[in-house]
């Protein structure tokens, strides 16, 4: 057996089901192979795996090891797979220690909220996991480094019924002594602030972005510690002065605060956060592959129309992020627009994009 998966994922670290589904593939040369029996063995140590049964109880925040043995149509053992792993996350609301937080602004306020907390670790860390739920999108940082490779997390739901949370391994980002955890929240699908297709601007769940975060630490001496969102966090706004899932972002670099997401930053002028109610009654693990950068593309051509207007063509349609390196005086405004078509003279054609969905900044 090869390609072992738990809940259809390879080596997942954030499962919230007590009865996961195990799958695998047969890789062999026998075309008429038929499996007559299989046995899954599971345990918290790779050296002590026991037969898996339906009444086996899994614990939250635990790594499990498993393999599978397959018998062929003649009743002979075909082979035993290599050992795979998965980790459970949270099974119920009482597994969470944190509180939902936001800032003091309402849903029409445009600048994106930023949050941070400094903390000190006095012991050697064995492993660390962070669990993040957000009404809106989040970018999470620990000691100034972005957590994970995913973008646009968490995924879309009916935000007044169910919110997804994402689990990250952040062991390598932490250090003994002073540390900091920080995040910036985007509106995403949760708070569309302009007229939009399917009337998202009138969605019943619309509200200011908010988050729930829990950093769970296990030390080498076997003890654990949890650092979670609560009243001790601080909040401010910064360079993201506008963000919209349809029409884009406005970013003002003059509002940047260097080191805001790192340890040692002075957040004494930041405001205290507002502890708020949960936006939905149900929290569920996001059990799907994340949206990630899989390829970097270079423009195929560049056409200059004036000293202030350039068109870069990639000659293909794709979803992605743009990276542009520029020089200019502070306060210089640069507008980056995207489109799927070009006009006959090579200029950008946005006529096939609804006016309210065109990028504004």
Model regions: which residues?
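Extracellular/oxidizing-compartment recognition motifs
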Residues: 1-359
């Amino acid at each position: 057996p090869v390609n072992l998966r738990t809940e259809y994922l390879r080596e997942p670290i954030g499962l919230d089901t007590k009865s996961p589904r195990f799958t695998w593939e047969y890789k062999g040369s026998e075309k008429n192979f038929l499996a007559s029996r299989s046995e899954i063995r599971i345990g918290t140590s790779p050296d002590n795996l026991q037969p898996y049964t339906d009444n086996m109880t899994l614990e939250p925040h635990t790594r499990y090891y498993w393999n599978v043995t397959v018998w062929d149509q003649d009743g002979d053992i075909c082979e035993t797979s290599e050992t795979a792993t998965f980790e459970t996350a949270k099974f119920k609301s009482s597994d969470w220690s944190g509180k939902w937080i936001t800032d003091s602004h309402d849903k029409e306020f445009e600048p994106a909220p930023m949050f941070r907390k400094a903390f000190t670790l006095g012991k050697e860390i064995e492993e660390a996991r962070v669990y993040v739920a957000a009404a809106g999108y989040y970018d999470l940082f620990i000691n100034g480094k972005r957590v994970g490779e995913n973008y646009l997390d968490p995924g879309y739901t009916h935000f007044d019924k169910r919110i997804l949370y994402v689990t990250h391994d952040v062991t390598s980002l932490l250090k003994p002594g002073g540390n900091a955890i920080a995040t910036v929240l985007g509106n995403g699908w949760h708070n569309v602030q302009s007229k939009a297709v399917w009337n998202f601007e009138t969605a019943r769940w619309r509200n200011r972005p908010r988050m729930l975060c829990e950093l769970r630490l296990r030390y080498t001496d076997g003890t654990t510690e949890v650092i979670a969102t609560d009243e001790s966090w601080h909040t401010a706004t910064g360079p993201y002065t506008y963000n919209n899932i349809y029409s884009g972002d406005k970013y003002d670099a003059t509002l940047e605060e260097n080191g805001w997401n790192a340890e040692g930053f002075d957040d004494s002028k930041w405001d205290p956060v507002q502890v708020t109610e949960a936006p939905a009654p149900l929290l569920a693990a996001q059990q799907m592959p994340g949206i990630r950068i899989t390829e970097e593309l270079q423009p195929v051509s560049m056409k200059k129309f004036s000293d202030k207007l350039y068109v870069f063509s990639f000659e293909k349609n794709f979803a992605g992020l743009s990276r542009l390196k520029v020089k200019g005086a502070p306060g210089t405004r640069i507008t980056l627009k995207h489109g799927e078509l070009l006009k006959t003279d090579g200029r950008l054609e946005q006529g096939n994009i609804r006016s309210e969905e065109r990028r504004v900044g």
